[in-house]
Amino acid sequence: RPLVREVRTSARLVADETRLYHVTTKIDGWVEKLFTATTGQFVKQGDPLFTIYSPELVTAQQELLTAAQSGLTELTAAARRRLTLWDVNEEQIDRLLASRQIEKTLTLNAPVSGWIVERRFSAGHRAMAGEVLLTLADLSSVWADADIYQSDLAHVRVGMAAELSLPYWPEKRFAGKVTFLSAALDPASRTLKARMEVPNPELLLKLEMFGVARLSYDLGEQIAIPEAAVMRTGERTYAFKDGGDGGD
């Protein structure tokens, strides 16, 4: 009959690196006001995170107003482009042109919905252009890192189905698949790192949780008998067959 073998190994939940988003500023300046920027906090896309004051921003706005007032079309367009490159949106630019009120600070908003997993600044921080200030993680899908022993390596493949269980919810099973196998063994444990992608739509799985990963692979058609029919003496193994005559 067809048989399936199951590989069981411990797994640790980590963030999906393709779902990490860095919040940076594109201009030099100083962080003035913090909104929702606490490590571990959930933010929605578009939520304000913090404001930054930059003399460059003030100068660029003044140049736009001057060019627009003078009717210099090309200079006005260039000034608008500069502001949009600094993440000032078109609505804010139109409001500036209508009110002629220069904004001294720029509000940076969350690019995606997710959890703040790292914050590298406080109010008053001197921020440099390109500096990573916050890191957000979308946890709607997570990675489970597991160690595979050498005896099972021949059967583990990228793309194979995987299942994750947690001691906290023994009745729950989280389906996933293997998406990565390391190119080298760990020199200490002599195991290979395998990564599983596990959908997490209900957000029940949290980073740094530990669980048990199950990987199943087909052994093909094999001769199989019930385990109860096997007797091991230490030196030999015997299999008993029911003759069907009801005798002792």
Regions found by a protein language model. Give the residues of each.
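Periplasmic scaffold and linker elements that assemble and bridge Gram-negative envelope complexes
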Residues: 1-181, 185-193, 197-199, 203-206, ...
